């Protein structure tokens, strides 16, 4: 039943079409030439689509419009269009065979395609890192900053703990510049003033060595990272890795006492008798002279 309806719809559509699609058209053909060729079939208008081609060379820019090798011819009614297709399809025009057919207008499918994946949402809400309620982050401090200077800076808010550290940052993400080190600090405060108000007040009014500083609420993840690094450094300093055990040196070879050797030589000179060996071990013996 569905196929019958579709066929009837297609048949009704083709009977109302008055435009003919012409392909394999010579590139040298003009709209005037093609209109004269179709004049006997009642063609009211002819259109040859072109594209604009721009080149750097000036000598090729005299006619930048290039035809696509196709054309559309408009007729007064469907009967004339079908007559032109029947008589002229396959005929030669300017040494090229033409191909004609009814031009069916394109219609988009109204039913959505369920197989097509939906594009991912680009504007996703970024998660904001959690900030601490009692710790601030001081950025781009002098390299030789001291604990006392930072305490004096936050003296109105009772500073408790201060961690001074250095980290590598990149100024530009698109160009791979070498990173540079910055000195920063995490300062834990004991105050009833909201941490945001403290940051605004210190950043606007306080200066460090004549320069303003950047103060923001510290991220909880950064505080945990710095504390873990400090803990690891203290552990390594307290329990250094054991040194490699050195191999024992070989025992020295036994040496014959000088007194025993001299005594044997004296006896040999007196009695002309070879002296007995010093011991039963492999000690070297001295012959009589």
From Swiss-Prot:
Biased composition annotated in UniProt, kind: Polar residues: 279-289
GO cellular component: cytoplasm; nucleus; prospore membrane; ribonucleoprotein complex
PROSITE patterns reported in the protein's UniProt record: RRM
Protein name listed in UniProt: Regulator of rDNA transcription protein 5
Coiled-coil zones: none
Keyword RNA-binding in annotation: yes
Pfam families tied to this protein: RRM_1 (PF00076)
UniProt keyword terms in alphabetical order: RNA-binding, Transcription, Transcription regulation
Similarity-based family: Belongs to the RRT5 family.
Feature: compositional bias, Pro residues: 239-255
Misc note: Present with 51100 molecules/cell in log phase SD medium.
